[in-house]
């Protein structure tokens, strides 16, 4: 399949703070027949929103480098930053990463803001840093090593596989599936089924118009105001509180 690379608009670098060098880049890819965006990113924050008025995918990237002179920071960014977006068939592929130098480690990150057209599904493979997705229309698939994940005001199914870090999901029209190693999970105002597999950490699920399934090893579980059935498999160590369930409640050891 033909691989089309899109050019990068480079804005002037600036010194945000006395010890932080910041450089801003913007990437634009016409959406056309694209129905899926795949994001591979390393250290840094990630914010995604649906921009219904746009017919292209727009990426704003802030590259931050700590404790280097402006000249050294520019040289580091030029040599070690990988930032590009390509079109392959009906998919857009975004890569945002930093090469790590172990002999002389540098504290650096790439913070991303991504605007996508309505109906474009997003698949995320993230290293570390907070992820915030809101006012989004499309399906989401998130694979994350660590960091806070916030998903709110979404129309579409959401799937999250997380190593560690807090997960917040609120006001979603679609089914939810979460697989979490450690960290608390908060799920609120969902119109769809919820399925959670958790290693450790508190789980709070409330106001769900659908069925709820939880598989848990340890940590407190609070479930309330559910219109469908609730199934708890292998409740581990931790308090279990279940209230105001319209369907059946089943616990399996």
Residue ranges and their predicted role:
Residues 1-7:
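Positively charged n-region of N-terminal signal peptides that target proteins for export
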Residues 7-16:
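Bacterial N-terminal signal peptides
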Residues 20-126, 132-143, 148-162, 168-179, ...:
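Acidic (Asp/Glu) and glycine-rich low-complexity loops/linkers
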Residues 1, 17-20:
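Low-complexity, intrinsically disordered short segments enriched for Gly/Pro and polybasic residues
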């Amino acid at each position: 399949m033909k691989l089309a690379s899109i050019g990068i608009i480079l804005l002037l670098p600036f010194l945000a703070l006395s010890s932080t060098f910041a450089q801003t880049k913007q990437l634009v890819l016409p959406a056309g027949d694209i129905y899926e965006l795949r994001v591979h990113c390393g250290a840094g924050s990630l914010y995604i929103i649906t921009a219904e008025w746009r017919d292209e995918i727009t990426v704003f990237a802030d590259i931050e480098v700590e404790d280097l002179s402006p000249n050294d920071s520019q040289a580091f960014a030029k040599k070690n930053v990988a930032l590009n977006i390509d079109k392959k068939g009906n998919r857009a592929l975004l890569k945002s990463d930093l090469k790590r130098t172990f002999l002389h480690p540098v504290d650096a990150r790439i913070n991303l803001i991504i605007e996508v057209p309505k109906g474009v599904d997003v698949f995320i493979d993230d290293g570390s840093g907070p992820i915030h997705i809101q006012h989004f229309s499309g399906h989401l698939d998130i694979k994350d090593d660590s960091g806070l994940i916030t998903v709110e005001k979404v129309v579409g199914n959401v799937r999250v596989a997380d190593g560690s870090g807090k997960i917040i999901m609120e006001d979603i029209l679609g089914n939810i599936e979460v697989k979490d190693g450690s960290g608390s999970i908060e799920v609120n105002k969902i119109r769809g089924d919820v399925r959670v597999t958790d290693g450790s950490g508190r789980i709070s699920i409330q106001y769900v118009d659908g069925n709820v399934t939880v598989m848990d090893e340890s940590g407190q579980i609070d479930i309330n105001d559910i219109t469908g059935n609730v199934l708890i498999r292998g409740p581990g160590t931790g308090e279990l509180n279940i209230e105001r369930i319209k369907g059946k409640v089943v616990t399996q050891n």
